[in-house]
Amino acid sequence: MNLKTQRLELIPLLPYQLRAWVEDRNALERELDCTYQAEPLEGVFLEIVKGQLAITEQHPEEYLWHSFWFLVRQSDRVVVGSADFKDVPDARQEVEIGYGLGKAFEHQGYMTEAVQAMCDWALAQENVAHILAETERDGWASQRILQRCGFREDKRGETIWWKL
């Protein structure tokens, strides 16, 4: 189940594809006919992906809520970024979204396109009423993405929580 925007194809990675991203990116690129140029899969980001991989493998039927979605530019099949829902919708019918973009692709509107499409899809599901996002207090670019997608500031502390 892929989503398409004006410039992007959003591909939610199946559990075995998420594992391939961690273990054999070249094989995944061949399978998806793409070239990965998004944020480097290392450090804290790699640990986050591995954590989501474990959950996705335990609950493959809910992979759309746990796996990462590749943001593939349609014109040349370059993966410019990734995004994910961090868990299944909770009892309040809320789900959190996270996202990251390769540095070379910042400030071109790709993430706004992707976040809007993913939020539209999520809100069309019967168990989702709201989408949450967390940004750093100085994460101006990320905050602008959320504002363009209709999010409003919900709580402010060490970080800022947003709600759609």
What are the language-model segments listed below?
Residues A129:
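Short acidic/polar active-site loop segments enriched in Thr and Asp
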Residues L146:
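Conserved active-site tyrosine of GNAT-family acetyltransferases
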